[in-house]
């Protein structure tokens, strides 16, 4: 009579053959025929085990067992042939030992002892059952929750210091290079000595309303003429250092700019806008008394730097999502700064047209040449003709780059109510257009 497994239970074969079981002898469990059946020259059959164990907890596993029973219903498990297939327990693996004819069933826990890294238990169970595994459940696994799982050793050359990648938790809690805490300005007391003219001149205006005026320093701090500020600029002033100094003076040594007005005007906005702070910073520098002295011209490299700052502020304002409703006061401030830059570039164009060498010692290299009026490109020093040609092309490019910006400002000004401020902005934009065309025409002559 054919033995059948109980419903919802795994069907597995006996560990020993029927002949050894009836004889109550130990079977060596060789497949396809054990040693005793080979000596007796009789077929070695393995019956279905009567003790099948507990039913599986997972319903899909039980359904797979029932489907396997239906597929093998026509076959007699008692008379299984040596070449036939047999079903094994799900928690065992089939390992090959010795020659190709000898097979042994080994437990999975014993074979996994030699592994260097242990896999996730949830993933192993899903692979054994054969179900679709959701990798979101791996986040709850203790192995993946450890910080070592996300740390990797970079392949560094010999002698280099080994680095490690930070975990996502560390990256989320860290302060990036673009965060407000890192981008905060430096304090005013830590300014270098060459920025003293900015610190002392503006500090009294910033603190005059809340505290007594500070005693101004003598001429050691505040330069009395444009030649002194030019000398300070020659001592190693770089564009990045100047930007840090402007930040420190504008923010009054605070960690972050004041954005209360921006957030109050846009309460539903989650982004912080620094456009107004940048425009105030630029206007404070342009209107500095040392740069606005009569009968004096700004250095060419200073004018190029301010033109680059103006262009970047224009780009930020036009692309800012918070500043979608452009303020006429912001446009007026940008027009004033742009007019100052155009005046400086027009002075350079006028000097080139008249043949004068009043470029203020424009230099493009880190180590300037001995000649004050030469341009150093790497190790080469340009002569007068090449210097004039390069300067002319550079000024022409900078002037033409501001033309579409002024056209955009004119379009934004048309949104205004048509009051006195809107009319003033229209007049300033037209004046800047006229100055740009005049400078370009002067350079073409």
Curated annotation (Swiss-Prot):
GO terms for molecular function: DNA binding; DNA-binding transcription factor activity, RNA polymerase II-specific; zinc ion binding. Residues 17-44 bind DNA. Keywords: DNA-binding, Metal-binding, Nucleus, Transcription, Transcription regulation, Zinc. InterPro entries: OAF3, Zn2-C6_fun-type_DNA-bd_sf, Zn2Cys6_DnaBD. GO terms for cellular component: nucleus. The keyword Transcription applies. It comes from the Eukaryota. Residues 77-89 have a biased composition (Polar residues). The keyword ATP-binding does not apply. Residues 50-89 are annotated as: Disordered. It is found in: Nucleus. Residues 51-60 have a biased composition (Basic residues). PROSITE patterns: ZN2_CY6_FUNGAL_1, ZN2_CY6_FUNGAL_2. Its main location: nucleus. Transcription factor that regulates the expression of the gene clusters that mediate the biosynthesis of the host-selective toxins (HSTs) AF-toxins responsible for Alternaria black spot of strawberry disease by the strawberry pathotype. On cellular level, AF-toxins affect plasma membrane of susceptible cells and cause a sudden increase in loss of K(+) after a few minutes of toxin treatment. Gene clusters encoding host-selective toxins (HSTs) are localized on conditionally dispensable chromosomes (CDCs), also called supernumerary chromosomes, where they are present in multiple copies. The CDCs are not essential for saprophytic growth but controls host-selective pathogenicity. This is Transcription activator AFTR-1. It comes from Alternaria alternata (Alternaria rot fungus). The gene is AFTR-1.
């Amino acid at each position: 009579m054919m033995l059948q497994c109980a419903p919802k239970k795994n069907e597995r074969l006996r560990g020993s053959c029927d002949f050894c079981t009836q004889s109550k002898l130990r079977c060596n469990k060789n497949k396809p025929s054990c040693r005793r059946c080979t000596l007796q020259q009789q077929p070695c059959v393995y019956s279905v085990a009567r003790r099948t164990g507990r039913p599986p907890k997972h319903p899909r596993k039980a359904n797979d067992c029932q489907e396997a029973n239906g597929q093998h219903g026509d076959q007699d498990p008692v008379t299984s042939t040596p070449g036939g297939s047999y079903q094994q327990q799900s928690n065992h693996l089939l390992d090959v030992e010795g020659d190709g004819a000898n097979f042994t069933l080994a437990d999975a826990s014993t074979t996994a002892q030699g592994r260097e890294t242990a896999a996730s238990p949830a993933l192993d169970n899903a692979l054994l059952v054969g179900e679709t595994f959701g990798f979101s459940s791996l986040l709850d696994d203790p192995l993946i929750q450890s910080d070592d799982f996300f740390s990797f050793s970079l392949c560094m050359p010999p002698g280099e210091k080994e680095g490690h990648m930070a975990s996502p938790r560390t990256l989320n809690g860290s302060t990036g290079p673009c965060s407000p805490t890192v981008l905060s300005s430096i304090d005013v007391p830590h300014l270098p000595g060459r920025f003293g003219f900015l610190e002392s001149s503006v500090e009294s205006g910033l603190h005059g309303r809340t505290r007594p005026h500070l005693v101004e320093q003598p001429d050691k701090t505040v330069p009395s003429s444009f030649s002194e500020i030019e000398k300070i600029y020659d001592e190693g002033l770089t564009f990045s250092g100047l930007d840090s100094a402007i930040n420190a003076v504008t923010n009054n040594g605070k960690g972050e700019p004041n954005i209360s007005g921006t957030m109050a005007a846009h309460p539903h906005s989650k982004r912080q806008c620094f456009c107004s702070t940048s425009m105030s910073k630029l206007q404070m520098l342009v209107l500095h008394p040392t740069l606005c002295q009569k009968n004096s011209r700004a250095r060419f490299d200073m004018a190029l730097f301010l033109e680059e700052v103006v262009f970047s502020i224009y780009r930020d304002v036009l692309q800012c999502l918070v500043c979608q409703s452009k303020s006429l006061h912001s446009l007026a401030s940008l027009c004033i700064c742009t007019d100052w830059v155009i005046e400086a570039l027009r002075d350079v164009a006028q000097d080139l047209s008249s043949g004068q060498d009043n470029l203020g010692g424009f230099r493009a290299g880190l180590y300037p040449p001995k000649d004050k009026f030469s341009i150093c490109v790497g190790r080469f020093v340009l002569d007068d003709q090449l210097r004039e040609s390069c300067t002319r092309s550079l000024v022409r490019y900078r002037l033409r780059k501001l033309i579409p910006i002024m056209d955009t400002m004119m379009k934004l000004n048309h949104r205004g109510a048509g009051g006195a401020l809107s009319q003033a902005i229209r007049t300033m934009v037209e004046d800047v257009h006229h100055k740009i065309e005049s400078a370009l025409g002067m350079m073409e002559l």
